[in-house]
Amino acid sequence: MDLLDAHLVPAVDGVAFGLLLFVVAAGLSLAFGTAGVLNLSHGTLYAIGAYTGAELSDGTWGGLALGLAAGTAAACVAGAGLSAATAPLARRGHLAQALLTFGLALIGGDLLIQVFGADELPVRVPEALDTSVTLLGHRYPAYRLCFIVMAVLLAACGTWVLTRTRMGAAVRAAADDPQMLAATGRNPRAVHTGVLAAAGALAGAAGVLGAPIIGPGPGTSENVLMLSLVVVVLGGLRSLWATFFAAIAVGEVQTLGVSLAPDLAPYLLFAAMAAVLVLRSRFAEPAAAHGPEGAAPDPVARLRSRLVAVLRRRPLPAWANRLPGGPAWRQAAPLLVLLLVLVSLPALLDAYSISLAGSALALGLLAVSVTVLTGYAGLPTLGQTAPFAVGAYATANLAEAGWTVGPVQLVLSALAAAVFALVVGPAVIRARGTTVLMITLAIGELTGAVVNQLKSVTGGADGLVGFPATRALWGGEEMLEESRLYTYALVVAVVAVSVTLLVLRSPAGKLLTGTRGAEARMRASGHPVGRYLLVAHICAGALAGVGGSLMVTVQQYLSPADVGFEIAAFALLAVVIGGTTSVIGALLGAGLIVATRDWVAGSWPGHGPLLLGVLFVATVYLLPRGLAGLRGGPGGGNGESGPPSDTTGAPGTPGAPGALGVTSASGASAAEDQPPSAPAPTSAGKASP
């Protein structure tokens, strides 16, 4: 009884927190389950409401009502705008949506900070609620009790609208049978826009009412997004009641769980998320990949097609046609030019720019590992920062222990990352499409929780700094100058990329490509597809570990932000910029991202996220097949292809409610997802004609 009494307040806090998450997650579930939009800017919609409500709060009921109306309306308009923004991506899958909405989240977050400031805003609740009441012998904030009532009413109203009104019937029809909805004379695109507007309104209302609980400030949008994703995954997309109970469970873990088991609670949420996704992926049925009825034409298609046509029609320069060796030499010439430019950078740039170039090489190796998984194995990932973090912290701890020889650090870090990839690989390789994207996200976030909690190894939130510098070889001096560090990073990157290219262009690489393009045929031919994917996952993990080791060597410090979700999104963006099967393109994309984040943003201080967000958006719209797709035939020549569409329904596809876990373990891809250079190998391991 004493134990129950001691934890009563955290338990009630968990109910309030869970109801807040339910309102937010209901909007996210509505957007994803009905409109088919994987909205990674949903936390920003919450932040819009929270900032607006905090700014208009003045301690009166009128201020609360005005803030609720304004915040809900602003987020509703933003949700409707999101419908227009995602319309051009109607048949490109959830990966393109994720990149676009993450870019919009960066832009929105930067604009909110510019308008409201970088500090967390205070929220003034009405004076009548700015007090405490007695609850079973404990003093408890009156506003939180009032919020519980308001959240229950809001949830009840939303459930009634969805299940008892003609509007709700149209929404359900859009999810279950869009063709029938169109036959009744309703415009599915209008329903799609209305659903996203309603999802935004829910997030905005939750932001206004929940601002005293999760206040508006830096990191709010990402925190709300991650918790909402956990709720949606645990509760599923078909049942509001399941979402409700999942939200309450998450709220209790965040409050009561921290009170009862503070060391265990940080790991529970994302571990449960990964476990649920893995189980669903094993018992799911394949989903049809189809586009929305009445999808609007791509407003940037003509601009993009003209750009591609111009670049493809440009003949090679006369000097290129005179190069010896024929087409093979001309294909290698750009690589040699790139290498020449990289080698000459120390003579052309200042020390700071050289250090940025070294960081770009480290991020580039991470991006190349994502290329192996996304472009060749067909496993789009947002969690490759996990083996990247293993390699980085392994190198930092080796340096602290006196193991400062570079090759030793690289080998041991790659080995540690490979072992990590081996352990988590079985959970990843059975899933496909959006499911694997969410599983890898959960693994990445779980690794981030370990980084923050395991202070004896990682330094926690403070990170690691002050460890000895790396020596290039046995008996060598410590590398302290930026030029020496860059040269070391360049040598490591050249070796790693060369090995990767040799493997990908070998028969083993052809087999791996076949697992993405014609998995069912390969299985029928007797190929152990699961084994191929597991080996690819291990090798990609080792490569990411080398990148993490290189980052620590170049930076000479390490913090959780260096291995967080944002870095995972940057790596995926680098892959899309270059073309998902272009290793060199991934390196170029990483260089462009680092230049935008650290060099261009230096001339416009405080606006790095805005510039990166613009880069995300521009890449998704203008480079659907990356830089590699601008020259050559379909797919960008030489087998280059755009980002693989997931198999769970296209953006705006009302039939996407099963996206989290409905794809079969065999993972047959949609036809549009098959790269031109991926014929199914025969049982002898050769490509079939």
Sequence positions of predicted segments:
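Transmembrane alpha-helices and adjacent helix-loop boundaries
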Residues: 5, 17-20, 66, 80-81, ...
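Transmembrane helix boundary and interhelical loop/hinge segments in multi-pass membrane proteins
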Residues: 161-169, 173-177, 503-509, 515
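Short amphipathic alpha-helical coupling elements at transmembrane boundaries
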Residues: 87, 91, 170-183, 513-514, ...
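Alpha-helical membrane-interface segments at transmembrane helix boundaries
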Residues: 8-19, 87, 137-139, 234, ...
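Non-cytoplasmic
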Residues: 27-38, 204-220, 230, 545-560
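Short, strongly hydrophobic alpha-helical membrane anchors
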Residues: 1-9
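Hydrophobic alpha-helical segments
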Residues: 229, 236, 248-271, 276-278
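Transmembrane alpha-helix interface/packing and boundary motifs in multi-pass membrane proteins
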Residues: 28-38, 214, 230-239, 369-379, ...
